[in-house]
Regions:
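Positively charged n-region of N-terminal signal peptides that target proteins for export
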Residues: 2-4
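Alpha-helix C-cap/termination motif
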Residues: 7, 68-71, 261-264
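Bacterial N-terminal signal peptides
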Residues: 8-21
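Short hydrophobic "helix-edge" motifs at membrane interfaces and signal-peptide entry regions
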Residues: 11, 39-42, 263-264
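Cleaved targeting-peptide boundary
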Residues: 25-32
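Structured, acidic catalytic/metal-binding patches in enzyme active sites
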Residues: 32-246
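A cross-kingdom marker for long, charged
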Residues: 241-305
């Protein structure tokens, strides 16, 4: 079983709740990243695949993404990271992740799974007794975020936080395709069997974290679509319900929103998790089927502008 952990990147609300230091602007990293120029009936915009978490020592952005940001007068993200009440959102997420008072996590999980979870929680520094009041989806995110942080990958260094801070300084408005409440409700509405599958994969793959994160970061910077698809989509073959809920339905809603946009005088930059740009149900493929044309931006093209 392979690397489903990478797929939680697209839904980690910690992106919106982290500290946001001011990252110095850079000339961009050497690879092309994952950036498209999209043309359609309502004008031109950029579509970029993001890494919500990056390593603080490797936080520079690909040159095509830098170009897309410079050329855009507004930013569209999964959620509006500039308009979130952090304390309120954190409280809602914690409340949503709580088990019902009468529920018992050890009984819901079974003895073997509970033992493995308790060991993983202890290794990550969490109190198992307190954590036992959370639903499996919340525990999956907790363990994943802790594992990312141990390897130096943080949302404070991630693409959204960097561009949020820059957009504030550059007076570029930010909007969201969804709200934090919508993402919380999506996770909290997952069937318990799906949540158990999520937790199983998280526990199985924690040991692979260092290699997986570095491979994912390298593939994203290189714009290596086959490798990104292998890393990000492979686990969904055995979890079709999760794939439909987290990817297919959301991508289709976003395409509907994009098609409803009024024509703008200058381009927007649409920035979503890289997971949403790969595969037959990825945004580029869906937009093409909706009559849009897409063109990958290269390093040479970015340098020539």
């Amino acid at each position: 079983m392979r690397r489903l952990l990478a797929q939680w990147l697209g839904l980690l609300l910690w992106t919106a709740l982290a500290a946001t230091p001011l990252w110095a602007s850079s000339a961009g990293s050497g690879g092309p990243g994952l950036v498209y120029e999209v043309d359609g009936p309502n004008g031109r915009f950029y579509l970029a695949g993001s890494m919500h978490l990056l390593h603080a020592e490797r936080a520079s952005l690909p040159a095509p993404l830098e170009r897309a940001y410079r050329d855009s007068t507004s930013i569209v993200m999964e959620i509006d990271t500039d308009d979130i009440d952090e304390e309120r959102t954190a409280a809602r997420m914690l409340a949503a992740a709580q088990l019902a008072p009468e529920a018992s996590l050890p009984i819901l999980l079974g003895e073997a799974r509970w033992t493995a979870l308790r060991d993983a929680l202890a290794e990550a520094g969490f109190d198992a007794e307190r954590a036992s009041r959370f639903e499996p989806w919340g525990l999956s995110l907790m363990l994943t975020q802790a594992a990312f942080a141990r390897q130096g990958y943080t949302s404070a260094a991630g693409v959204e936080q960097q561009l949020t801070e820059r957009a504030k300084r550059d007076d570029k408005p930010i909007s969201g395709l969804e709200t934090a409440e919508m993402q919380i409700a999506l996770l909290d509405g997952l069937d318990m069997n799906v949540q158990r599958q999520m937790l199983d994969r998280t526990l199985e793959e924690l040991r692979e974290m260092p290699q997986m994160l570095d491979e994912l970061d390298a593939a994203w910077r290189a714009g290596d679509l086959p490798q990104l698809e292998a890393l990000l989509l492979e686990g969904y073959r055995e979890m079709p319900e999760l794939y439909t809920a987290l990817l297919v339905e959301r991508n289709r809603r976003w395409v509907t929103q994009i098609r409803a946009w009024q024509q703008a005088a200058s381009p927007r930059l649409v920035l979503v998790g890289a997971l949403h740009l790969v595969g037959e149900q990825g945004l580029p493929a869906l937009l093409q089927r909706a009559g849009y044309t897409t063109r990958r931006l290269t390093v040479d093209a970015a340098a020539g502008e």
